[in-house]
């Protein structure tokens, strides 16, 4: 349900939550600072986007899209689940190199290529019927306290939508790992 996405901070967010939902640059680099980072591709397929995703991509729900779902882990624990989509063009993804990324984070390409432009962040609390909530649940994460962000990247007019969902355990880890830093200041 696309109407749940907003470019404004959600009510009741902590300073940490607001920061992580709207921080520019590579999420992967920030996660690596918290511990041993790994990425697990859970699915990579051609499928149809959900209505809100299709709207953000500027296509219809019956237009095939290349979809990649991953779990971003710190110390082998799922902290973020992510879903990337790009429309198919003439039986190829609009961003063809993405199909070969395997277990590599997309950030190395997205932030090192000058002709790629990122749009504004949107955030939401995913509901049970949201693809991010379903992905989190499939990874064994409780779906009740999820926070997500998404943004659209453009290259040569071709969109790539990336949605990232922070699971409940992420915020606990962040508190645990940042507490010594706060005490030292």
Curated annotation (Swiss-Prot):
Keywords: Cytoplasm, Lyase, Pyruvate, Ubiquinone biosynthesis
Pathway the protein acts in: Cofactor biosynthesis; ubiquinone biosynthesis
Subcellular localization, as worded in the UniProt entry: Cytoplasm
Cellular component GO terms held in the UniProt record: cytosol
Family according to the record: Belongs to the UbiC family.
UniProt signal peptide: none
Protein name (Swiss-Prot/TrEMBL): Probable chorismate pyruvate-lyase 1
Entry's Gene Ontology molecular function annotations: chorismate lyase activity
Residues annotated as binding substrate: 68, 106, 164
Phylogenetic placement of the source organism: Bacteria, Pseudomonadati, Pseudomonadota, Gammaproteobacteria, Pseudomonadales
Reaction(s) this enzyme catalyzes, per UniProt: chorismate = 4-hydroxybenzoate + pyruvate
Gene name linked to the record: ubiC1
HAMAP family: UbiC
EC numbers for this chain: 4.1.3.40
Purpose: Removes the pyruvyl group from chorismate, with concomitant aromatization of the ring, to provide 4-hydroxybenzoate (4HB) for the ubiquinone pathway.
Disulfide feature: none
Enzyme class label: lyase
GO biological process, one term: ubiquinone biosynthetic process
């Amino acid at each position: 349900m696309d109407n749940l996405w907003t470019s404004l901070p959600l009510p009741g967010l902590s300073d940490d939550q607001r920061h992580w939902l709207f921080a520019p640059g590579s999420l992967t680099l920030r996660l690596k600072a918290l511990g041993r980072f790994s990425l697990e591709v859970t699915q990579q397929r051609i499928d149809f986007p959900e209505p809100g995703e299709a709207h953000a991509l500027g296509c219809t729900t019956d237009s095939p899209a290349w979809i990649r779902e991953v779990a971003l882990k710190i110390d082998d624990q799922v902290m973020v689940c992510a879903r990337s989509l790009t429309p198919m063009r003439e039986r190829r993804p609009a961003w063809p190199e993405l199909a070969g990324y395997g277990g590599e984070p997309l950030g190395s390409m997205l932030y090192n290529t000058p002709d790629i432009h990122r749009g504004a962040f949107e955030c939401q609390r995913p509901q049970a019927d949201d693809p991010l909530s379903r992905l989190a649940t499939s990874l064994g994460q409780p779906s009740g306290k999820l926070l997500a962000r998404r943004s659209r990247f453009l290259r040569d007019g071709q969109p790539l939508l990336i949605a990232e969902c922070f699971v409940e355990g992420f915020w606990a880890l962040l508190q645990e790992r940042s507490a010594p830093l706060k005490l030292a200041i």
